[in-house]
């Protein structure tokens, strides 16, 4: 019973559509009708600005972290925190409070890792920031970090680097989260190929793509 309650709580936590609600209640703007139509951090930044984007990012990360820490907070030592955190990402991606149309799972996945393996998250965040600096594309940075996450979760434990040993639940969760992130970025991948992906005004833009307003 406790397990079911933890899963349900994590899913409902993840389901809070941060960007959508911030847009509706503070800006009277429906994010679904602007930019890419996505309710995640990137579109919130683009449409509503820095304050709203930063708030969305922090809350979406916090959703994942809090869900991951739930078993610890309620003293359920026999329940895997990473497994509970996964249901927050599921909620974020398919939120019951927003017609099951949610974000692209990046921020909340980061939150889950922050609660479970913070040093490992720091490594993936460095990969994300480096890719973002080189290519000026948030989507490409997210995809690169996801692929690196899968490779590293399979290899780092052997060298006891950042991850102390193989944890099959962590490994499965990382692989599934990476798959969700990649699947949620299908449109972005097409635009990257066509050299029409949205750029941010930071970094080297090594692909030499021209800035575009394409959404």
Curated annotation (Swiss-Prot):
The cellular component terms of Gene Ontology attached to this UniProt record, alphabetical and capped at eight, are: plasma membrane
Q: What class of enzyme is it?
A: transferase
Give the matching Pfam families.
G3P_acyltransf (PF02660)
Q: TM segments?
A: 3-23, 42-61, 68-90, 110-130, 134-154, 162-182
The subcellular location is: Cell membrane
Principal location class: membrane
Q: What is this enzyme's catalytic activity, as reactions?
A: an acyl phosphate + sn-glycerol 3-phosphate = a 1-acyl-sn-glycero-3-phosphate + phosphate
In the bilayer, the protein is annotated as: Multi-pass membrane protein
- Which InterPro entries does the entry link to? G3P_acylTferase_PlsY (IPR003811)
Pathway(s) of this molecule: Lipid metabolism; phospholipid metabolism
- What binding partners and quaternary form does the record give? Probably interacts with PlsX.
NCBIfam families linked:
glycerol-3-phosphate 1-O-acyltransferase PlsY (TIGR00023)
According to UniProt, the name of this protein is Glycerol-3-phosphate acyltransferase
Lineage, highest ranks first: Bacteria, Bacillati, Bacillota, Bacilli, Lactobacillales
Gene encoding the protein: plsY
């Amino acid at each position: 019973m406790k397990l079911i309650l933890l899963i349900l709580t994590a899913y409902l936590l993840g389901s809070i559509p941060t960007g959508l609600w911030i847009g509706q209640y503070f800006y009277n703007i429906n994010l679904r009708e602007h930019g890419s139509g996505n309710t995640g951090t990137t579109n919130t930044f683009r449409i509503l600005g820095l304050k709203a984007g930063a708030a969305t990012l922090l809350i979406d990360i916090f959703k994942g972290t809090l869900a991951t820490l739930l078993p610890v907070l309620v003293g359920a030592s026999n329940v895997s925190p990473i497994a509970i955190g996964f249901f927050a990402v599921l909620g974020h991606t398919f939120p019951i409070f927003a017609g099951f149309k949610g974000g692209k799972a990046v921020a909340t996945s980061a939150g889950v890792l922050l609660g479970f393996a913070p040093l490992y998250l720091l490594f993936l965040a460095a990969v994300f920031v480096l890719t973002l600096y080189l290519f000026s594309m948030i989507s490409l940075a997210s995809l690169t970090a996801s692929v690196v996450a899968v490779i590293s979760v399979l290899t780092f434990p052997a060298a006891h680097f950042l991850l102390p040993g193989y944890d099959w639940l962590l490994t499965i969760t990382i692989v599934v989260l990476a798959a969700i992130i990649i699947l949620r970025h299908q449109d972005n991948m097409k635009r990257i190929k066509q050299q029409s992906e949205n750029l941010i005004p930071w970094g080297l833009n090594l692909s030499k793509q021209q800035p575009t307003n394409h959404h």
